[in-house]
UniProtKB/Swiss-Prot annotation:
PANTHER family: MOTILIN, PROMOTILIN. The gene is MLN. The keyword Secreted applies. Residues 1-25 form the signal peptide. Belongs to the motilin family. It is found in: Secreted. Pfam families: Motilin_assoc (PF04643), Motilin_ghrelin (PF04644). It comes from Sus scrofa (Pig). This is Promotilin. One of its GO terms (molecular function) is hormone activity. Keywords: Cleavage on pair of basic residues, Hormone, Secreted, Signal. InterPro entries: Motilin_assoc, Motilin_ghrelin, Promotilin.
Length: 119
């Protein structure tokens, strides 16, 4: 028969395995003090950035509100960049969504033509 020590060891190992499987296994890499120092450094960086932005805006003077800034122009360019979209369907899905796809594809050239006419 199995000794009591072996049974106890197996029970302890089993309990440890159960606890380990239910935890998120978070192991802190940094100490609490190190985390506080890093957060303080990040706050200082944020303050320096906001200060430099404020100084730059003071140097430029008042801007015309209707005139976009360089950052806004970059955002607009990124939003207007063409995007290719691909869809993979099997024959059953194609049969099911054929009417909707034909309607969408019929509308796509119209919206493209409207954008070109506006320019």
């Amino acid at each position: 028969m199995v000794s009591r020590k072996a049974v106890v060891v197996l029970l302890v190992v089993h309990a440890a395995a159960m606890l380990a499987s239910h935890t998120e296994a978070f192991v802190p890499i940094f100490t609490y003090g190190e985390l506080q120092r890093m957060q303080e450094k990040e706050r200082n960086k944020g303050q320096k950035k906001s200060l430099s932005v404020q100084q730059a805006s003071e140097e430029l003077g008042p801007l015309d509100p209707s005139e976009p800034t360089k950052e806004e122009e970059r955002v607009v360019i990124k939003l207007l960049a063409p995007v290719d979209i691909g869809i993979r369907m099997d024959s059953r899905q194609l049969e099911k969504y054929r009417a909707t796809l034909e309607r969408l594809l019929g509308q796509a050239p119209q919206s493209t033509q409207n954008q070109n006419a506006a320019k």
